[in-house]
């Protein structure tokens, strides 16, 4: 079992990073929370979750998910334990909402907050709350995640959205509208706002 990966950051995008360790480059899928946490780091230690990807169009493969903190990984694992919430949906939730906000929404039964995430309908939101309310209890999540903006914000946001499976043209239109509305949006803000309108 792979508990964590530590090494040099070869590539960094809002949706994934490539970490080199002992001459091997690992592609690790990340949330926006983790992307923000990495800042301008040259090296990183990410706590990992491994999953098998089984699709009709591609061969079976191992997918690595990485998280800046153990707490974020625990929340990811709790989310994927809920029927109807897969790895991509859980990662999308952690990108659209902070771990604190997700936990608060579950504890307080706030369906609307969970439903604000693309792909989470009423039934899935209810299932998340019912299945996880007792498991989460009074658990606190670290709020050490900080925002970051570098390179071309629009390009990075576009990469993240297309990696998450959204249409490139629609994503670009949404990002252009958002930047016209507020040119100061960070990459994370752009992606979060785009997730709400796509």
Regions found by a protein language model. Give the residues of each.
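Short coil-to-beta-strand transition motifs
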Residues: 1-5
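Conserved hydrophobic positions within beta-strands
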Residues: 7-9
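Long, highly charged, low-complexity intrinsically disordered interaction regions
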Residues: 11-113, 128, 134, 138-141
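Small-residue helix-packing motif on alpha-helices
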Residues: 90, 102, 125, 171-174, ...
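Amphipathic, coiled-coil-like alpha-helical scaffolding segments used for oligomerization/assembly
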Residues: 115, 119-122
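Strongly charged, low-complexity linkers/loops
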Residues: 128-176
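Amphipathic alpha-helical interaction/assembly segments
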Residues: 187-198
């Amino acid at each position: 079992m792979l508990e964590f990966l530590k090494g040099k950051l070869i590539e960094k995008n809002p949706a994934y990073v490539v970490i080199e360790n002992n001459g091997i480059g690992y592609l690790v899928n990340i949330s926006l929370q983790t992307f923000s946490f990495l800042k301008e780091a040259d090296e990183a230690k990410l706590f990992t979750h491994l999953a098998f990807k089984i699709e009709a169009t591609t061969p079976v493969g191992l997918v690595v998910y990485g998280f800046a903190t153990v707490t974020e990984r625990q929340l990811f694992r709790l989310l994927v334990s809920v029927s109807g919430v897969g790895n991509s949906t859980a990662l999308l939730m952690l990108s659209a909402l902070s771990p604190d906000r997700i936990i608060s929404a579950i504890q307080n039964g706030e369906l609307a907050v969970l439903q604000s995430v693309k792909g989470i309908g009423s039934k899935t939101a209810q299932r998340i709350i019912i299945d996880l309310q007792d498991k989460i209890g009074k658990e606190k999540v670290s709020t050490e995640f900080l925002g970051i903006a570098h390179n071309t914000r629009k390009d990075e946001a576009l990469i993240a959205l297309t990696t998450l499976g959204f249409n490139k043209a629609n994503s670009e239109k949404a990002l252009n509208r958002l930047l016209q509305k507020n040119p100061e949006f960070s990459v994370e803000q752009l992606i979060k706002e785009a997730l709400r309108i796509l």
